């Protein structure tokens, strides 16, 4: 029904093969520029353009710094090939522009505009409405793309800004259950406690979930989070084998994990 001028795909390793098939079909039918972004295409940007003829560009780094300015130039009919993080073909070669710097202050990013979505509630009641509360993880687990994509730099939006987003989406869509999108939400204990305090002061009840490492959370923090509406928490334990913990550079103290899980 629609004839888009650009089609972009957010890529992950677990579904990259599906994205490739979809992109191939879109290119064959519409002929519009195909752009890949996200962690999988970011890591293999050169290989993607060398091996996949129907992908025209790869945007590396944070979308606000790369995808947005490049898309804007394409829609103007004046592609800006100087955008940091852009990877493209030129005269048979692959050109990889310098990677953009990470956004220092995530509070400067505008709220996501969901008005173009269908009119029904843009949230999954089972997993929560996703809000980007921060980015990055300082740890170096060998299997994880986070350390490569975000550069092992931990960033968290301010408690005030996170609360403003909760209120905004609650007031606009009536949403009361949120998924706090961050690989390591509990890294900054003081900030997490302040976020929980602000949530408790809301005139209505909200619920939420998050992700954390088992060595960056304890019973006291769990109680504080639960009192502010925490419904469940995803703990990245990965393996119960001490040998495998070392091999993948996770290095958790496994003897502390089971008591914590039982408490949760």
Report the location of each language-model feature.
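Alpha-helix termination/capping residues and helix-transition junctions
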Residues: 1, 51-52, 80, 138, ...
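Glycine-rich beta-alpha loop elements in corrinoid/cobalamin-binding modules
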Residues: 2-102
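Radical SAM [4Fe-4S] cluster-binding motif and immediate context
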Residues: 107-264
